[in-house]
Amino acid sequence: MTEPIVVVGAALLDADHLLAARRSAPPELAGRWELPGGKVEPGETSEAALARELREELGVEAEVGERIPGEWPLKPPYVLQVWTARLLPGSPQPKPLQDHDDLRWLTPAELWDVPWLDQDVEAVREIAGRL
C-alpha cells in the first residue's frame, strides 16, 4: 500500500474573509476555485510547506495557524490537509503568480458564489463554520 502524499491548503483569513484562488492550469481545473497550497516536499513539515507555497503562489509572507480537522482524498496517492493562515504584518497583498489567474477575498455570505474544486468543498464547509 502506498503512503499518502500530503497536499497542504491554506484557509488564508483576513478578519472574516477567506482567500479563494481561481485555477488557470491545468486545463481540466481552469476556472474552478481552490484554497491555495501545494505538495509537502520530502523532509519538510506541513507548516513549512504551506508557508513556502503561499510565498511561491501568491508572493506573501504568512503565519500558519491551526490545522482544520479532517483529511480529504485527492487523486491517489494524494490527500488534502488544510491549515488556517494569516498574512504577516508588512506582507504584500496576494497576487496570482502560479497556476491562478484571479483571487477573491470571500465573506461568509459569498463562500458559495464561486465554483470550488470538488476536493475543496468539504474543507470549505469546515472553514465556513469558523468564520
Where are the model-predicted features located?
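Conserved Nudix-box catalytic region and its N-terminal flanking loop in Nudix hydrolases
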Residues: 17-56
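A SAM-dependent methyltransferase catalytic signature shared across enzymes that methylate proteins
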Residues: 55-65
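Active-site-adjacent beta-strand/loop module that shapes the phosphate/pyrophosphate-binding cleft
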Residues: 61-62, 70-94, 104-108, 120, ...
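A generic structural signal for short hydrophobic patches within well-formed alpha-helices
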Residues: 111-112, 124
